[in-house]
Amino acid sequence: MARDKQRTKKKERKNIAAGVAHVNSSFNNTKILISDVQGNAIAWSSAGTMGFKGSRKSTPYAAQMAAEDAGKKAQEHGVKTLEVQVQGPGSGRESALRALAAVGFNITAIRDVTPIAHNGCRPPKRRRV
């Protein structure tokens, strides 16, 4: 007997005017999460989900594509203004920020929330190339 197909519920369109864009840019990848003011996720994307693999994930272009993708998804939910929180030392920070502005968001604040260790963990050893 054939099993009944399980129906997937279509994502409901939330109507949120303001949101927070969390841009996490590491040395290897750039992730963008757009949430509401309380922190509930609305849309997200990363350089890896955009189809970039390996060292291409860490490029500014990959970060730009990921930011555009997350921005378009968030606009479907009615987000118009964004507060941007940037974290990490990666090369995709500025390009992701510019891409979010180019999508058409009104950016109200840009905040750097990179954690700074006060002599915490020992850093990784230097690369010998």
UniProtKB/Swiss-Prot annotation:
Any one Gene Ontology molecular-function term assigned to this protein's record: rRNA binding
Family listed: Belongs to the universal ribosomal protein uS11 family.
Name of the molecule in the record: Small ribosomal subunit protein uS11
HAMAP family associated with the record: Ribosomal_uS11 (MF_01310)
Encoding gene per record: rpsK
Cited function: Located on the platform of the 30S subunit, it bridges several disparate RNA helices of the 16S rRNA. Forms part of the Shine-Dalgarno cleft in the 70S ribosome.
Pfam families found in the cross-reference section: Ribosomal_S11
PROSITE patterns reported for this sequence: RIBOSOMAL_S11
Keyword Hydrolase: no
Species of origin: Dinoroseobacter shibae (strain DSM 16493 / NCIMB 14021 / DFL 12)
BP terms from Gene Ontology: translation
Entry superkingdom: Bacteria
Complex and partners: Part of the 30S ribosomal subunit. Interacts with proteins S7 and S18. Binds to IF-3.
Keywords from the named record: Ribonucleoprotein, Ribosomal protein, RNA-binding, rRNA-binding
Gene Ontology CC annotations of this record: ribonucleoprotein complex; ribosome
